[in-house]
Structures are given as structure tokens and as C-alpha cells.
UniProtKB/Swiss-Prot annotation:
Residues 1-20 form the signal peptide. One of its GO terms (molecular function) is metalloendopeptidase activity. This is Zinc metalloproteinase nas-25. GO terms for biological process: molting cycle, collagen and cuticulin-based cuticle; proteolysis. The lineage of its organism: Eukaryota, Metazoa, Ecdysozoa, Nematoda, Chromadorea.
């Protein structure tokens, strides 16, 4: 048995979430080698928003690695939203501010607390940019996805696998106090993993109603709806309503509030108008009425330290036809290496669902072929990794 470090979320105090660093274990089961990672919603009370969409912050006693995680997270949030992080010094006294500090946990209050300086804590076990974005999203007012008032439509909670002291972490938010601005997304960076707070090794505490999403929950990849709800909550899209030229976005894209002539694009789509395959590795595969086979791979780039390398491919066919794909990972040893709740070491996402914005079911564990039929065309196929070279055998055709 290999032992790794992961994070858990412990709800403490008022509107504060702590992600406590603890060990987790990768073990074998009939589902595969599943990692154990203990680790959105917005308040209707707008006083928790940061004035002028600006968060003053300064960095305290953290390592250079954490500083890089914070820098990358801020760059990502500022690229997708109108939120601005203003770097100030520790003597800042013109209002509320955020201090990035290591308090031995991954934690943040929810929204602006109006107490002067509030802490966002990141420690060495808070993994990369994904966790930094998670905590900064808490700081600007975003709660956990699985706490939404409509959660029970999407999850089954297995209370028998949760200690009584941990059950408050699964309480629902009041719809009177908290608003759901976007659809429920299992792949949100704000969603718990399937085994969060489990009191038994290799036992789930929550199961998606659609079981194919069990590996998707617990993602370290911020998705389209994560940024979209920030933009709605902070009314970022208002800047584009009066714009002279507005991008005509395809495939579910929305004009970027920082530049209304280009689009924020869902994963798997790129270009200024979301009508192109994203730049970088990957290829466009043209389907015929006969099965074709192709190996699709992603190799980690050291330039993507603290995050992931992505390769985006498209499968295209005639507009009036349905696409069929069959895929499976080529190496069982790599499968065992990357298999985890959250697929945070690598995996694949085939965007076959009709909503191009939502996270589809990701795979990093199954050792049998997956078979999909979809009218989505072109069909995005996203491979990603945080280290290992991941390769899938792909068969495809149209019918």
C-alpha cells in the first residue's frame, strides 16, 4: 500500500472552511485503485462581496512554491473574471484585505468578513494552483457545490460511513440565504470527492445519482461554471451589455468581461469565438462509417508545474450523423498510478453531453472499454496529466 498526502475539509466557526492536511491511502477494490482524498454557492447578502470587485491582499509566511500557486491562481481568476487582486503591504489600512499565510491548513472564510485582515491559509500539502483557486474562491464568496440546497437531486449521502462529528460538513445551505447561479456541476473545483470524511478505508460518503461521475467529483481543475458564477455574482457581465462590439460565441462560450470581443470558452473549445480546437497538442480526427483506431496521449510539460498539461482532440463527422467512440487506457500500471477520486493526477474527459459548458464524466480508473454514442459534433476529447504520460486507445466512427 502506498501512502500519499491529501487534504480534507473541516467546517469550523462561522462561515469558515478549513481543509486539513491528512494522509490518504490508495487501495485496491473491485472498482480499481481508488485514491482517498478527504477534503458554490453565493450568498444573497451582498455585503460579503468585495467592493469594486477588488480584493486587496498580501503574502505572508509561505514558501516560494505556495507563492507560485497563489500567483497562478490569481492570474487565472483575473483572466476569466472581472475580479482584481490588489497587492498591498501588511500595513494596509484602507479597508478589508486578505493575508496569504501558512496556518497549517488549507482554509478560508467565505466572502469578505469586514474584520480588517482575514486569512487564507495554504500549507505545503495544499496541492498546486487548483487548491489555491479553491481557497481564493471561498474568500470571494463561493461555497462548496455539494452544500447546495438542491444537492439531494444529484447526490446520495452515505451517513453510515461518516462520523457524527463530521455530519455538519454535509448540511445543506438555506435557499433563503444562498443562491444557485449555475447548474450543478460534479466537476467543480468546489466539490468534495466521493470519500470525503469517510470513517472507513476505501468507503464512499457520497455517490452521484449518475454513478459515472464518481471519479469526477473532487477535481483540482476549475471549470467554466466556476468562473461563470463569479462573473454573475459580481455582475461582471454588465461591462459587455453596453459594449459596441460583442463576441458571437459558439459552443456555450460567453463574452469575457475583460474584453467583450473575445469569449470565455468551455473546456475542449478554443479560439476567440470558441469555434476552434484549443491550441497545443491533440489532433482533429475525421470519422467515417467504418471503425478507425488511434492512440491519443498527453505527456506532462514541466512548464505546467503545479497544474496540468492538457491535450485537446476533436472527432468530427457529417453534421447529420451520430458519433460512436470506444476508448480505454493502454497501460494498467499507469491506470493504477493515476486512479483517484477527482482524477487529479490525470485522466480523460469526452464531452458527449449536450451542455457544452458542464463537466462530463471523467475516467482515470476503469480497466474496461468505455462506449459512447453522441450527437455532439465536433466531439471534444480532453486528456490531461500532472506527471505520468497517459495514453488511450480510441476507436471512432459515425452512424
Amino acid at each position: 500500500m502506498q501512502i500519499y498526502l491529501g487534504i480534507t475539509i473541516c467546517l469550523v466557526a462561522f462561515l469558515t472552511v478549513i481543509d486539513c492536511a491528512i494522509p490518504y491511502y490508495r487501495t485496491h477494490s473491485n472498482f480499481g485503485s481508488l485514491g482517498r482524498r478527504k477534503v458554490r454557492q453565493v450568498q444573497r447578502d451582498l455585503t460579503y462581496r468585495w467592493p469594486n470587485n477588488t480584493v486587496p491582499y498580501y503574502v505572508g509566511n509561505v514558501t516560494s512554491t505556495i507563492k507560485k500557486s497563489v500567483r497562478l491562481a490569481i492570474e487565472e481568476l483575473q483572466a476569466w473574471t472581472c475580479i482584481r487582486f490588489q497587492n498591498v503591504n501588511e500595513k494596509y489600512s484602507d479597508g478589508d484585505s486578505v493575508r496569504i499565510v501558512d496556518l497549517g491548513s488549507c482554509s478560508s472564510p467565505i466572502g469578505r468578513q469586514q474584520i480588517g485582515t482575514q486569512d487564507v491559509s495554504l500549507t505545503k500539502n495544499c496541492w498546486g494552483m487548483g487548491t489555491a483557486i479553491h481557497e481564493l474562491m471561498h474568500a470571494i464568496g463561493i461555497e462548496h457545490t455539494q452544500s447546495r440546497s438542491d444537492r439531494n437531486r444529484y447526490l446520495d449521502i452515505l451517513a453510515q460511513n461518516i462520523d457524527n462529528r463530521d455530519l455538519p460538513n454535509f448540511e445543506l445551505l438555506s435557499p433563503r440565504l444562498w443562491a444557485n447561479l449555475v447548474p450543478y456541476d460534479y466537476g467543480s473545483v468546489m466539490h468534495y470527492s466521493a470519500d470525503s470524511f469517510s470513517n472507513k478505508d476505501d468507503e464512499q460518503t457520497m455517490l452521484p445519482k449518475d454513478r459515472s461521475f464518481i471519479e469526477t467529483m473532487g477535481s483540482m481543475i476549475p471549470n467554466f461554471y466556476d468562473f461563470d458564477q463569479i462573473n454573475q455574482y459580481y455582475q461582471c457581465y454588465d461591462s459587455c451589455r453596453n459594449a459596441g462590439q460583442l463576441a458571437n460565441c459558439a459552443n456555450g462560450g460567453i463574452p469575457n468581461p475583460n474584453n467583450c470581443q473575445v469569449c470565455n470558452c468551455p473546456m475542449g473549445y478554443g479560439g476567440d469565438l470558441c469555434d476552434q480546437r484549443p491550441e497545443g497538442c491533440g489532433s482533429t480526427l475525421v470519422a467515417t462509417d467504418r471503425w478507425q483506431k488511434q492512440k491519443l496521449s498527453v505527456r506532462f510539460s514541466r512548464n505546467d508545474d503545479q497544474y496540468f498539461t492538457f491535450c485537446n482532440s476533436w472527432i468530427v463527422g457529417p453534421s447529420d450523423r451520430t458519433l460512436q467512440v470506444i476508448y480505454e487506457i493502454t497501460s494498467d500500471s499507469i491506470r493504477r498510478q493515476i486512479c483517484s477520486f477527482g482524477c487529479y493526477e490525470g485522466g480523460i474527459e469526452v464531452k458527449h453531453l449536450q451542455d457544452p459548458r458542464i463537466t462530463n464524466d471523467r475516467d482515470c480508473c476503469l480497466n474496461t472499454p468505455l462506449n459512447l454514442t453522441t450527437t455532439v459534433n465536433p466531439l471534444p476529447v480532453i486528456l490531461y496529466t500532472s506527471g505520468a504520460t497517459v495514453t488511450y486507445d480510441f476507436s471512432y466512427r459515425y452512424v
